[in-house]
C-alpha cells in the first residue's frame, strides 16, 4: 500500500509547487451546501473555490490529478457536475452521501467521463457501503477528511 498525497488549493502557483514536490492530487473544494451548519463551532477551514479555479489549475498541472469535491446530491447536482467535468476535473468526489440511490445518481451524472471518489463520512453511508461498492463506476472511496 502506498500513500497518495492531496493538497487543497485554488492557486496555480501553489499547485505547481505541490506538483513538483510529488503531490498526486490537487484538490479544489466546491462543497458549500450545508457545510456551515455541519461545521458550526468547529475550528475548520471552509474553502471559497469556484469552477473557474478548476480551469486555471488545469492549465498548469501536468502530472498531478485534479480532484474536485462537489456539493452533496441536491437539485442542481447534474449542472454542477457537468460544469466540473467541462472545466477539466480528473476525479470528482461526492461528500455527505447517505444512500445507494444518491451514489447511483452521482455516477449517472458523471457517466464515466472522469474518475469518481466517494467520501465516506456519515453513519448512513457506512451502513450501506457493502451495497454501494458493488455499483459500477466507483473508482475510489476516501475515508474522512
Task: Tell where the protein language model's regions lie, with residue ranges.
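Active-site-adjacent beta->alpha loops and helix N-cap segments on the catalytic face
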Residues: 34-57, 74-79, 96-114, 124-128
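Conserved N-terminal beta1-alpha1 strand-loop-helix module at the mouth
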Residues: 1-64, 73-75
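Glycine/small-residue-rich loop that forms an oxyanion/phosphate-binding "nest" at active or ligand-binding sites
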Residues: 62-95
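Short, ordered loop/turn segments at secondary-structure junctions
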Residues: 30-33, 71-72, 97, 143-145
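Glycine-rich beta-to-alpha transition loops that act as phosphate-gripper elements at the mouths
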Residues: 6-12, 68-77, 96-97, 119-126
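Conserved anion-binding
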Residues: 63, 87-89, 94-145
